[in-house]
A protein has these predicted regions:
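Flexible phosphate-sensing "switch/lid" loops adjacent to ATP/NTP-binding sites
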Residues: 1-325, 332, 374-375, 384-496
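Catalytic nucleophile serine of serine hydrolases
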Residues: 337
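Short active-site segment of divalent metal-dependent hydrolases/proteases
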Residues: 340-341, 439
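A conserved active-site-flanking secondary-structure segment within enzyme catalytic domains
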Residues: 344-394, 399-402
Length: 496
């Protein structure tokens, strides 16, 4: 029987340093080494979320990490989720259920923080009773000392869990010595003792050139450098931060099926398109440029955290007109979740669930009307699209109800295994669905691409589940080969 290990927390010198991906790697490594790990992030801020088997909502990163660990995802892995709806306001999701909208000042003030702290601590305790080790992830930088008293996710959480903290730094952005040294020196005396190691992430070039730098950093901070993880390009792990959109392709190319994802201001769940991005038959790109939309064979309208605001912006910047023009010219248009709502005749928000806009006309491509509601639908679903016999999987996360225009007969796109219906189907080039993950199903992808068969240069079909498992193993091998795992296990065994 394996000896129990201390929890480990991957804390960061800043945002987007690679904490989530390294956490996924460690989850897979511990699984490979015979442990039963589970991920934990007390508070996550993201628009990419996922539905648990119980029909509750967590951050997508923790769902990915759970998949890497080989365990079902659960709200205890991410008890507090913030979903931004504007620059200043977020929907607060506690233990998988929305409890209201808060602006930043309301959320970070001290009143009510202890109740939230008790909730995230209780979630950790439940998780730690079922799994070992717990692979914890901090949020952003651990150096925001002005937020220390109300912090729920970084060093106070590590202290509660009695976790060994590993500081992750991104050398690719420069200033790694200052960021590591500053992050350590800004901690309290007790918190400094909790930081047991440093991981230098995203290194480019010959690692031997940094050997002297490792010694300098260890001498400066008094903390061992556990590893230098090289930058990689050939490993593909789903990421939830919107910053990754900055690195995605933005233009059409010749010789493949061009699929344009409309780049909404409040785009959510862009992981819906990861499977298509790996399909060699197509070229998928993100754009809100009307000229690039005109070059697409298929236009996908993605999910949105603020559908009415995005609809208003699409009309203002000409994208709405470009989509309608493309549709008239024979381009396929499909909407997912908020994108499905955008394609309807009207969107109503009588109670101001999303904000101040109460009603707008939709794109008018589907004979449906959406009414925003405070009750959120969150569930995993099995379904069959149209007359297809293959069972597909996906999940729903939305706060609107979409119904047919009165007096109009609508063909549902999907029939759910529980007897329900989803979406609207006009023809093979015009449809919408509430189901996230619909584009992870090979049968549906083949149906979507079918009208463009003459453009296909490659007929290789990707088994996405097998592909993801291979990527987790590749990531684990990459991190394992550049990390001092014996020292990490020694630290987590309490022998540091």
């Amino acid at each position: 029987m394996k000896k129990n290990l201390h929890p480990i927390m991957l804390a960061g010198t800043g945002s987007d340093v690679g904490k989530s991906v390294i956490a996924a790697a460690l989850c897979r490594i511990f699984k490979q080494d015979g442990y039963r790990p589970a991920p934990f992030k007390a508070q996550n801020m993201a628009l990419n979320s996922y539905a648990t088997p119980e029909g509750l909502e967590i951050g997508r990163a923790q769902a990915v990490q759970a998949e890497a660990a080989g365990v079902p995802c659960h709200t205890d892995m991410n008890p507090l989720l913030l979903k931004p709806s504007s620059d200043h306001t977020s929907q607060v999701v506690l233990n998988g259920r929305p409890i209201g909208n808060r602006n930043a000042f309301e959320y970070f003030r001290k009143e009510g923080r202890e109740e939230l702290r008790q909730e995230v601590n209780a979630a950790f305790d439940r998780l730690a009773a079922r799994y070992n080790p717990i692979v914890m992830e901090g949020a952003g930088s651990i150096s925001e000392i002005n937020l220390r008293d109300t912090d729920l996710v970084n060093m106070p959480m590590a202290c509660y869990a009695d976790a060994d903290v590993i500081l992750v730094a991104d050398i690719d952005r420069g200033g790694v010595f200052a960021s590591v040294y500053g992050s350590v020196m800004l901690q309290t005396t007790e918190d400094k003792k909790r930081i047991k190691g440093v991981i230098i992430n995203k290194f480019r070039g010959d690692i031997r050139l940094f050997e002297s730098g490792v010694k300098m950093m260890e001498d400066l901070c008094g903390i061992p450098v556990l590893g230098i993880i090289p930058y990689y390009r050939n490993i593909h792990i789903e990421e939830e931060d919107s910053v990754v959109l900055d690195y995605k392709r933005m233009q059409a190319v010749e010789g493949k099926i061009n699929i344009a994802v409309v780049l909404l201001r409040h785009l959510s769940n862009f992981t819906d398109f990861n499977r298509l991005e790996r399909d060699e038959r197509v070229h998928l790109y993100y754009t809100n440029n009307t000229e690039d939309l005109a070059k697409a064979d298929i236009i996908l309208l993605p999910g949105s955290k603020s559908t009415l605001d995005d609809l208003y912006e699409l009309r203002r910047n000409g994208v709405a007109q470009a989509v309608l023009r493309a549709h008239r010219e024979g381009v396929t248009v499909m909407g997912i979740c908020g994108g499905y709502q955008l394609m309807g005749l009207e969107i109503h928000d009588p109670e101001g669930v999303e904000g101040e806009i109460r009603q707008l006309p939709g794109l008018g491509l589907l004979p449906v009307i959406t009414t925003m509601q405070g009750e959120k639908v969150t569930r995993q679903v099995n379904f069959h699209f149209l007359e297809n016999a293959e069972t597909c999987q996906g999940y729903e996360i939305h706060m609107g109800e979409t119904r047919p225009v009165p007096g109009v007969s609508v063909v549902p796109l999907n029939r759910l295994e529980d007897g329900g219906e989803d979406g609207c189907f006009v023809n093979q080039k015009c449809m919408g669905s509430y189901i996230h993950g619909i584009l992870d199903n090979q049968a549906f992808i083949d149906y979507l691409l079918e009208p463009y068969a003459e453009k296909l240069e490659c007929h290789t079909v990707l088994d996405y589940r097998t592909y993801k498992e291979e990527q987790y193993d590749k990531l684990a091998e990459h991190v394992r080969s550049h990390l001092n795992l014996p020292l990490l296990y020694q630290i987590m065994s309490g022998n540091d």
